[in-house]
Amino acid sequence: MDFVNGVGAQFVEDFFGMDNAQEPGPSVDAFNDAFQKKWNADSKGPGVHTQYDAVMVLALAMNIAKDLTGPSIRDAIRRVHTPGGTPVGTGPAEFKKALELIRAGRPIKYSGATGPIEFDANGDVSGPALVWKINNGQIVTDRTIGLTEMQALTRRIEN
């Protein structure tokens, strides 16, 4: 709201923007509930869920990697969300489950605080997004774009 007030609501009315979003599901619900209980606050702040996922993806990739060199961790990141892998979510119990699967040599499919995420061949991540707009001086969510729709949009842009 500092931006809207600083610029003046009359100048930004009906402006649109995009941000990362959370796609509804069990891992998102578990993260939001745990965050609320721990901090007595809503987890919908800028970067809260994406930063959590970044740390989790890195920690899981470090455990998947054959060694802790940059190239090995980089290559392991793609295997954090393996199609057909055993689903793992957020929180300590799910992290422990993921580590047990990794140690057993089984693939995992992480769905985090953001929801499902995927890495392409270049290591770029795709995930859900939201479109926000300024309406009567307030920032409101216009719509959420799920992972599948974001991937289709990315393919259209790339082609």
Each predicted region: which residue ranges?
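Extracytosolic ligand-binding ectodomains
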Residues: M1-N159
